[in-house]
Amino acid sequence: MNLKIEPYIQFLHDVPVMADSSYSVLNRSDFYVEDALVNKGRGRNIGIDITLERFLEKGLYYMISGSLFDSRYRGGDGVWYNTKFNRNYVINGLIGKEWMLGRNRQNILSINLKLTLQGGDRYSPIDREATMNHPDKEVQYDETKAFSKQYSPMLIGNYTVSYRINKKKVSHEFAVKGLNFTGAKEHYGHEYNVKTGKIDVSDNSTILTNVSYKLEF
């Protein structure tokens, strides 16, 4: 069994920001912008990573890891905010078991499970008045309180069940993999609902099951 603890602190300087605004490229997943930027922003990440791991022994292994962190930035207005990605915590649990089967115990039945619990994404409060006044009802946000709101935590679950048949010159592996069997939802922002006159959360849950066969020789 192995325990590892890693604290860290990171400072970012000369980050491109928009003058007199909460905008910073630290919150962007793409870097296409139309407005002029200045290198006067800053960023700060503080956290600790903890990992407890048992290596494979007697067909069993597991790992539990957790990250507690605080991620903030200073915009072009000189104010410190949460970054978009400041979930505050991520906890992972991974466990697997193998059984040796067959006449000569040469085949392997394997079951693996991974669960991830993490804080929700950050978003800015909705400016309802500005949204209603927008000609296309495009949702507007109060950027003076950038990323002060947070979606609900997410629980993501994945599993794999496989059976490997080992022969002298060839091996066969049958596997079933399930991704996000817990139905966790990804959030993509908000949109105005013309029918109800309300502003709804835009989200989606993708659950995948993959059946595979692999031949090795």
Regions picked out by a protein language model, each given a short descriptive name:
Residues 29-37, 74-78, 139-147, 193-197:
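Extracytoplasmic loops and strand-loop junctions of Gram-negative outer membrane beta-barrel proteins
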Residues 40-44, 83-89, 147-156, 203-207:
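Short sequence motifs at beta-strands and strand-loop junctions characteristic
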Residues 8-11, 32-120:
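Gram-negative outer-membrane beta-barrel transporters
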Residues 16-23, 29, 69, 73-80, ...:
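Outer-membrane beta-barrel translocator domains and adjoining extracellular loop/strand segments
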Residues 3, 46-50, 89-95, 155-161, ...:
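Hydrophobic, lipid-facing positions within transmembrane beta-strands of outer-membrane proteins
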Residues 1, 58-60, 89, 105-111, ...:
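Outer-envelope beta-barrel architecture signal
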Residues 115-138, 152-156, 163-217:
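C-terminal beta-signal and adjacent terminal beta-strands/loops
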Residues 1-33:
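Membrane-embedded beta-barrel scaffold of Gram-negative outer-membrane proteins
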